[in-house]
Design a protein with these regions (language model features):
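N-terminal metal-binding scaffold of metallo-dependent hydrolase/deaminase domains
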Residues: 1-39
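Divalent metal-coordination and catalytic microenvironments
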Residues: 9, 25, 49, 60, ...
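Conserved residues at the C-terminal ends of beta-strands
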Residues: 12, 69, 121
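Single, functionally critical "micro-switch" positions that shape active/binding sites
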Residues: 57-61, 89, 113
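Active-site gating loops and adjacent loop-to-helix segments of metal-dependent hydrolytic enzymes
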Residues: 66-99
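Active-site loop-helix segments enriched in His/Asp/Glu that coordinate
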Residues: 91-142
Length: 142
């Protein structure tokens, strides 16, 4: 049995009556004519012919730095050099818990806006690899 069935959707190429089957949080099928009569699901949504598009993808993100505006202070010049200096000031103050919390918050916000794939970069210049461990924990939870 499916967790979710979205039916009666329209694809960007104009195809109509499209159904999307979701099981265990993953899309398992996208096909024409997939309806509640043909597939049982715990929850069904009628798209009423509305447009169904692929999710947004962020191919370049620094999740270890997300939601850190103002930490330890605002980048007054807005320059890359000051940003790098600020990151150097912030790194000794970072905790794994704070990194995980901010990254998970960002992931929730991203999904709510239709962003379902994020390719992140991470600071590996810290001998502790704190940010790497934090983002591996985020990956495990998400």
């Amino acid at each position: 049995m499916l967790d979710l069935l979205i039916h009666n959707a329209t694809l960007p190429d104009g195809r109509t009556d499209i159904g999307v089957a979701v099981r265990d949080g993953k899309i398992v099928e996208v096909t024409a004519g997939l309806t509640p009569a043909k597939a049982q699901a715990h929850e069904t949504l009628d798209a009423e012919g509305q447009l169904l598009t692929p999710p947004f993808v962020d191919a370049h993100f620094h999740m270890d730095a997300t939601l850190s505006y103002g930490l330890p202070r605002v980048n007054a010049s807005g320059t890359l050099l000051e940003g790098i200096a600020l990151w150097g000031e912030l790194k000794p103050l970072l905790t794994q818990e704070a990194l995980v919390e901010r990254a998970l918050t960002y992931c929730d916000w991203a999904v709510a806006k239709g962003l379902l794939a994020i390719r992140t970069h991470v600071d590996v210049c810290d001998a502790r690899l704190l940010a790497v461990d934090a983002l591996l924990e985020v990956k495990r939870r998400v």
